Amino acid sequence: MTFSVQHAEIHFNQNHIPVSDQFDDVYFSNENGLAETDYVFLQGNQLWERWITHKDANFVIAETGFGTGLNFFAVTKLFREFRQQHENHPLKRLNFISFEKYPLKITALLQAHLACPQFEDLSAHLQRYWPSLILGCHRIHFGETTLDLWFGDVSENLPQLGDYMNERINAWFLDGFAPSKNPEMWNDDLYNLMFRFTKPNGTFATFTAASAVRKGLESAGFNVTKRKGFGKKRECLSGLKIQSKSTALSTPWYLAQPAKMEKQDVAIIGGGIASLCAAISLIKRGAKVTIYCEDDALALNASGNKQGAFYPQLSDDNALTVDFYLHAFSYGRQLLDWAIEQNIVFEHEFCGVALCAYNEKSAVKLTKISQLGLPNEIFQMLSAEQLSEKVGLPLNCEGGWIEQGAWLAPRQFVQNAFSFLEKQGVVIKTAQKITALSQLEKGWELKNMQGQKYCHEVVILANGHKITDFVQTEKLPLYPIRGQVSQIPTSENLLKLKSVLCYDGYLTPANQLKTSHCIGASMFRDNVDRDFSEQEQQENQQKLQQNIAQPWTQDVDTSDNLARVGIRCSVRDLAPMVGNVPHFEQQQADYYNLFNLRRRKQPIQSAANFQNLFLIAALGSRGLTSAPLLGETLASIIYGEPLPISEGILHNLSANRAWVKKWLKGSKVE
């Protein structure tokens, strides 16, 4: 499987307009691209007028053909003007979903944007976070506007919006190259999916008036109207969805279900990286967030190490898990940049991560990764000599190099970021061990060890391996993993280490004081003992010396017995969990015969979940990388907004996935 896409091949004509070499067509009008956007798409969908009467907190636009981003810039600017003029309006956020088969190179984007200096700030932000050439959804935040940029063929990506997005899109920009130039895109499958995902009274607008396009949209169910065309074009089309068509859910057992809220009152149980990232995404949407942490301070468990590596898990045999981590890695870097911009202080270094082929098994894994066709800034195989140069110390093996990898101080990051969130209104309650959850008519009651009770509309469980302590979650197939990370003094040799070094363990570069490194970590499943282990301390040292087998490794000295033990939460398939908490007993009753229900094509119930109860779990050893995108995904689900991941990834992260796989095979779930 490949995860990458190709760049667009373009040139600029005499009018300085970009022209596609693949499709032999201009990206926007030779006359006035911005005026065309305004007339065809903004006016064609009557956006300003509809925003005035809109009663929901978010408005969703989808677009075929991102191109230079001109349409996105124009609608983002218009929405900013709307928000400035209507500060107290219920409409707060704009979601813009766009599909692009051949993304432009950064240099081409820059040149194309020179014609529109009024979008200079938007252009700079887009260029800063312009994604690597990875298939799928890339979420980029522009204040109150969120861009979901899907790289790849729209015929493959649009279905990946999935059942969740049925009737959630308010307006369509049906753009792209002309039907005569790109006939593969303009087809009935596209029109039918557009209709399926469009809300009742949702609209579309397009620059073309081609007869086949009009008939296809009408056949899908839209009421189509001809308008005067822009410039020299005689006509263009717009349309309205008046009546719904019932659409059978393809995977009802995985359907994500938003919260039912009036006050946006959310409790998060847990005090680590998962809780933090969920809180960040929630407060951006206006939620009132309360954190319940059982420890006396935040980030004392799995998120409490002094140094941790930030890089994607690419060696999984499950392509959907790899796909998730590729996008989580990109989104996580965006969150770290946001934290730096907010002056949240935490030690970090964007130094790259080296993955050593220290034995035959690891060499095979890295070779498989190299065959995924990933961009070089994500992964590339290097010789021992090349890798040694990157690392700063001699190695005797080849390996993988992740240029954008980093290390950061997890505890410092979590604690200081939470301090920042407190100033934004987040309430933090430490020394609050929640022992029971009781469902109310509207929300949940939380009970602590002292018998005190708290009520909230929505509850998120993000308390690591203790997530199964509740009656509602005790059936989830999660387990704890003990890990001891050693802190070692630096030396003249170790100070030369320039990147994170991974083998059957990991070693970080020196901290910012240049006094110590972290090396780890032991792994013991179903072990929650937090006591220091001298044996594990020695094993952390021995693994490095055995795997790397270079003289400089003898400088590693764990005899000070400085170490930290944390308990991670994991699951057998090693993918995280995010979303609704499934109601096991009800799902067991609904799906025990799922194999036969599907075979007989009988009606199947949507997943029975606990209303307004959600989770982020099983982050394992990659929480720094996965938590930001998991938190953003969960906030999107809670608010009923478009998701930053594909339907396939969502299914792979669903908490009931292990049960469903058995039910689909006709097997029992105990």
Swiss-Prot record:
Q: Name a single GO cellular component.
A: cytoplasm
Keyword Methyltransferase assigned to the entry: answer is yes
| Catalytic activity as recorded in UniProt | 5-aminomethyl-2-thiouridine(34) in tRNA + S-adenosyl-L-methionine = 5-methylaminomethyl-2-thiouridine(34) in tRNA + S-adenosyl-L-homocysteine + H(+)
Concerning Gene3D superfamilies, the annotation shows: D-Amino Acid Oxidase, subunit A, domain 2, FAD/NAD(P)-binding domain, Vaccinia Virus protein VP39
* Alphabetized InterPro entries for the sequence: FAD-dep_OxRdtase, FAD/NAD-bd_sf, MnmC-like_methylTransf, SAM-dependent_MTases_sf, tRNA_MAMT_biosynth_bifunc_MnmC, tRNA_MNMC2, tRNA_S-uridine_synth_MnmC_C
Q: Which HAMAP family does the UniProt entry name for this protein?
A: MnmC
Family, as annotated:
In the N-terminal section; belongs to the methyltransferase superfamily. tRNA (mnm(5)s(2)U34)-methyltransferase family. In the C-terminal section; belongs to the DAO family.
Entry protein name:
tRNA 5-methylaminomethyl-2-thiouridine biosynthesis bifunctional protein MnmC
Print the organism lineage: Bacteria, Pseudomonadati, Pseudomonadota, Gammaproteobacteria, Pasteurellales
